[in-house]
Amino acid sequence: MSQLLTSRQAEELHKGIIAYLTSVNLHHSSAALREELGDSIRVDDTTLKKYEGLLEKKWTSVVRLQKKIMDLEARCASLQSELDTATPTSLNRKNQDPVSWLPRAPARHDLESHRSPVSCLAFHPIFSSLASGSDDTTIKIWDWELGELERTIKGHTRAVLDVDYGGPRGGTLLASCSSDLTIKLWDPADEYKNIRTLPGHDHSVSAVRFIPSGAAGSPMSGNLLVSASRDLTLRIWDVTTGYCVKSMQGHGDWIRDVTPSPDGRFLFSGGDDRVARLWDISSGDTKSTFLGHEHYIECVAFAPPTSYPHFAALAGLKKPPPASSSAEFVATGSRDKTIRLWDTRGNCIKTLVGHDNWVRSLVFHPGGKYLLSVSDDKTLRCWDLTQECKCVRTIVAHGHFISSLRWAPPLVKDAGANEGANGTEAASNGAKEDATKMSIRCVLATGSVDLKVRVFAA
């Protein structure tokens, strides 16, 4: 066997081993090693003190270097992927069109403070605030432009499973839900004071979303909130009173996700029964069911009206539905590693294959051309609806499972009013506007089991 160490390095290693064995009270082992080495090495109390902790330091430094190498390799792979798909236009950042902007590595900010996996994210509809929820029971508020932690919110007693900004006209609130069976409302204008707790669900509350203004002609513009739970129900709440105004049943197992349509007339949900459902909010009835996934449905999304022309081409329609239509196309992501695109009658238009593990979250680009997804395979993928849903960019975004993905909602006129603040659609009045008339914010965030939130921005 070839000698890898010089005689001096071998001597230092032996002294380090003896010092370590002595420090952990393995005196017999230490004495045996000294006897084996004989006169080739001399160890006294001064030597033991000098070499104490040496092995631990070298071990931890090796682990740190290995992690750094893995991060650099992942970043190189991501950059190579971008180069492979780059065009002269995409390389010119100065002339970037927000409608075509896609995230690229590295992230602008790595936000670290959570002590357990990050489970959910939400952008403030106007300001540069980003909320993150975690299994550590806390919600953290970050300034995503500066990359700084603003505050930590405590109140839930178990894992926080979802967060969302929205609320009554002129008064944005933050909603959160948890495995502790409750929904909590927080007031950003009053230092995120907990203004209301909504009990009622009989099991973990897995998703919460504000319903955009004017749902089904309701006079309670912006006052409505929908929640999904492991108790197999969807519940609609009036946030001004705290009362549950409607409970909807139909799923046969845990409801993992729910999202409202841009005009607030419909809900789309999915869960462990492998069925997605489209609901009419005003009647509480299921309008359509979506069958085809072979495992639990983890995430659902409504396609924005800006994407209708691309969906129409995929579906073989002669002309797209009008942009004023409330809910024409949807997407689902599953543990079967696929994403499915549907019309709202329940017909599967396209199945997107590429992820190597559970698909955990979906978001449509506000410009309508792309669908973005994150997965337990640690990647963020961008799918081009104009190229038969080809995956045009893959970013290794985290070192562990990616649990959440949110896009900062576009700024629209009358931004002080309630907006579809879930990061996947604009306000109901903004949904009718062309993408070029919206102020698209080229900012998105991902959250991971690696305890990090990453912000990607132009």
Swiss-Prot record:
Q: Which SUPFAM superfamilies match?
A: Lissencephaly-1 protein (Lis-1, PAF-AH alpha) N-terminal domain (SSF109925), WD40 repeat-like (SSF50978)
| Gene3D superfamilies in UniProt | 1.20.960.30, YVTN repeat-like/Quinoprotein amine dehydrogenase (2.130.10.10)
Any Pfam family hit: WD40
UniProt keyword annotation of Oxidoreductase present: no
Q: Which cysteines are joined by disulfide bonds?
A: none
Q: Which residues form a coiled coil?
A: 60-87
Keyword list, A-Z: Cell cycle, Cell division, Coiled coil, Cytoplasm, Cytoskeleton, Microtubule, Mitosis, Repeat, Transport, WD repeat
As for subcellular location, the record says: Cytoplasm, Cytoskeleton; Cytoplasm, Cytoskeleton, Spindle pole
Q: What is its main location?
A: cytoplasm
Q: Which residues form the LisH domain?
A: 9-41
Q: Where are the WD repeats?
A: 113-154, 156-196, 200-247, 250-289, 292-353, 354-393, 397-439, 441-458
MF terms (GO), sorted A to Z: dynein complex binding
Q: Which GO terms describe its biological process?
A: cell division; establishment of mitotic spindle orientation; microtubule sliding
One GO CC term on file: microtubule
PROSITE patterns per the record? WD_REPEATS_1 (PS00678), WD_REPEATS_2 (PS50082), WD_REPEATS_REGION (PS50294)
This protein's assembly is summarised as:
Self-associates. Interacts with nudE and dynein.
Q: What is known of its domains?
A: Dimerization mediated by the LisH domain may be required to activate dynein.
Q: What family does the database annotate? A: Belongs to the WD repeat LIS1/nudF family.
| Described purpose of this protein according to its UniProt entry | Positively regulates the activity of the minus-end directed microtubule motor protein dynein. May enhance dynein-mediated microtubule sliding by targeting dynein to the microtubule plus end. Required for nuclear migration during vegetative growth as well as development. Required for retrograde early endosome (EE) transport from the hyphal tip. Required for localization of dynein to the mitotic spindle poles. Recruits additional proteins to the dynein complex at SPBs.
The protein, known as? Nuclear distribution protein nudF 1
Species of the source: Penicillium rubens (strain ATCC 28089 / DSM 1075 / NRRL 1951 / Wisconsin 54-1255) (Penicillium chrysogenum)
